[in-house]
């Protein structure tokens, strides 16, 4: 689709979202478009420091967890001494960027709003690690904490997964992997999904939205996919194209959040409609006037904080509901 035919979303954003788009961090250099992946990762970490400031303080603990691929770093956020559940968080970044520090504020707020221990998983990034390594690392982390719950003062009878963007795909894929492989790490009471991609190769929203402002042009999405997958056949895998998995049974309750002007919004809509059609518990909410990745900007956008609180409320309600 010619770029000229796309919807001019920058003129339709909320005032708060426009303020974020136009915000210039003092001393921040331009995005290193021609830099190697490691340079881009360091820039992303630097750029996110401002957005992660002034986060709630709480007890944190870093733990290296053994997996079949080597140790994976995790960070435990404990807002109180005891927790009614454990929530595993997978960060976004197109499978190629991000770490526990780039999403620190999101995880701290989620821990505060749920009152539960949140465990961030610093899964291996692509292209150095290819599908399904990040999922298998996540499953290994869940298994480890299930077996060492007392050591870390965790309640793993009730667990959940959460993630944003690529992390949302990993969150849902990991939960389905546990179900499909009959791996028991606790009762998955909910999955919290913010503006994820779930396997669509094309859609109306991918044609109408996406540009330099969000890093989600058609070329960008193809690049992320090629970095993550081993080969073309992986595109149809039921843990990458999640619409090729069985979504008619035993899907944990899903909170599905989307951004109004996100090229990936149709992934969220289709996921919600599919689950709803098969009586799988789910809730869908679209946040008006927003772009992809708006969850990061809670320092300037109350709607980002609202989206986190909405997911937290969904999770807490499922803590009280026996499954």
UniProtKB/Swiss-Prot annotation:
Annotated catalytic residues: 165, 262, 292
GO MF annotations, alphabetized: carboxylic ester hydrolase activity
Record SUPFAM superfamilies: alpha/beta-Hydrolases
Any single Pfam family the record assigns to this protein: Abhydrolase_3
Motif Involved in the stabilization of the negatively charged intermediate by the formation of the oxyanion hole per UniProt: ranges: 91-93
EC number(s) given by UniProt: 3.1.1.-
Gene Ontology CC entries for this record: cytoplasm
Record key words, sorted: Cytoplasm, Hydrolase, Serine esterase
Domain of life (superkingdom): Bacteria
Location of the protein in the cell: Cytoplasm
Described function: Displays esterase activity towards short chain fatty esters (acyl chain length of up to 8 carbons). Able to hydrolyze triacetylglycerol (triacetin) and tributyrylglycerol (tributyrin), but not trioleylglycerol (triolein) or cholesterol oleate. Negatively regulates MalT activity by antagonizing maltotriose binding. Inhibits MelA galactosidase activity.
Family of the protein in this entry: Belongs to the 'GDXG' lipolytic enzyme family.
The protein's name in its UniProt record: Acetyl esterase
Native organism: Salmonella paratyphi A (strain AKU_12601)
